[in-house]
């Protein structure tokens, strides 16, 4: 992942909102409804964010309509952008596996 690619992705409309909402696994439909973003735009933004490794495919879940849908989660808890002279660097503090497991347990409990 190039720093400039991450910065460009963060500068695109809706991407920061999607990343904020992706602290727990969500489907494109959930992003669209919760953030009032057109569904086609959501899919394009998800693709862009996964290409820059800011978001990843987390799972495929069964919806209420008995259809499988993909859910996505951000790959980090903290992002730092540092400018030094003409150089720029991006550091991601990745989500801990323990936090991911806790999130999964809470999501499973909420679904029951």
List PLM regions with ranges.
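Short, cationic-aromatic polyanion-contact patches
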Residues: 3-14, 27, 60-83
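Hydrophobic residues on short alpha-helical segments
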Residues: 15-22
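A short acidic, leucine-rich amphipathic alpha-helix
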Residues: 18, 30-36, 49
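DNA major-groove recognition helix of helix-turn-helix
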Residues: 46
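Glycine-centered, phosphate/nucleic-acid-interacting loop/turn motifs that mediate DNA/RNA or nucleotide
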Residues: 53-54
């Amino acid at each position: 992942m190039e720093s400039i690619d991450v910065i460009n992705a963060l500068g695109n409309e809706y991407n920061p909102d999607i990343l904020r909402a992706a602290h727990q696994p969500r489907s494109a439909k959930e992003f669209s409804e919760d953030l009032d973003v057109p569904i086609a735009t959501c899919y394009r933004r998800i693709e862009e964010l996964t290409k820059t490794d800011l978001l990843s495919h987390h799972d495929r879940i069964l919806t209420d309509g008995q259809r499988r849908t993909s859910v996505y989660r951000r790959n980090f808890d903290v992002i730092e952008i540092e400018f030094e002279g003409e150089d720029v660097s991006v550091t991601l503090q990745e989500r801990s596996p323990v936090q991911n497991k806790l999130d999964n347990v809470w999501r499973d409990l909420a679904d029951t």
